[in-house]
Design a protein with these regions (language model features):
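Short, hydrophobic/aromatic-rich segments at coil-to-beta transitions
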Residues: 1-7
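Serine-hydrolase catalytic machinery in alpha/beta-hydrolase-like enzymes
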Residues: 7-100, 114
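Primarily recognizes the serine-hydrolase "nucleophile elbow" in alpha/beta-hydrolase
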Residues: 84-153
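Conserved small/polar residues in nucleotide/adenosyl-binding loops
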Residues: 158
Length: 159
């Protein structure tokens, strides 16, 4: 199994780092977005990618621009969605013959599902969520989940 660094072009002026992990006999690929407080190399993200690899699933983890810049304030949705789309496009290039899925942890899951709800992510067959922030702590509401009705691919939550 290899873990290779990749560069993902988000737009004309911005790139982000990624980690492409592929087992020898991969049968699928998951684009995996990190949560708001920890980047792609966080122990949860690494453990998830390692666990998926032992089961034959390649992963492309990536940084959102704010995390790449060392900021604690998450990107606004338009930039986060563009980053997810760019990561998906990169995964298509890296694994052209594998079924593709997208998802993430918490903030990454929400940004991926919002991007999919706005316009289908190319070649993505389903979404995988490792936790999904339905509302901020101690502020129950459903605004963050309303877009899920617009997601037209299968989705699975892992809690």
């Amino acid at each position: 199994m290899t873990v290779d660094p990749v560069t993902i072009r988000v737009d004309e002026t911005r790139t982000v780092s990624g980690l492409f992990q592929v087992p020898e006999r991969a049968f699928a690929c998951l684009v995996l977005a990190h949560g708001a407080g920890a980047g792609m190399a966080h122990r949860f993200m690494t453990a998830a990618a390692d666990g998926l690899a032992t089961r034959g699933v390649a992963t492309l983890r990536f940084q959102f621009p704010y995390m790449e810049a060392g900021s604690k304030r998450p990107d606004r949705p338009p930039l986060a969605h563009a980053t997810v789309r760019s990561a998906v496009t990169t995964a298509i290039r890296l694994t052209p013959n594998l079924p593709l899925f997208a998802g993430g942890k918490s903030f990454g899951a929400r940004m991926t599902s919002q991007a999919q709800a706005e316009a289908p992510l190319p070649d993505v067959r389903g979404l995988v969520f490792f936790g999904f922030p339905l509302h901020p702590a101690n502020k129950p509401a459903d605004e963050r989940a309303r877009h899920l009705a617009e997601v037209k691919v299968d989705r699975k939550s892992v809690v």
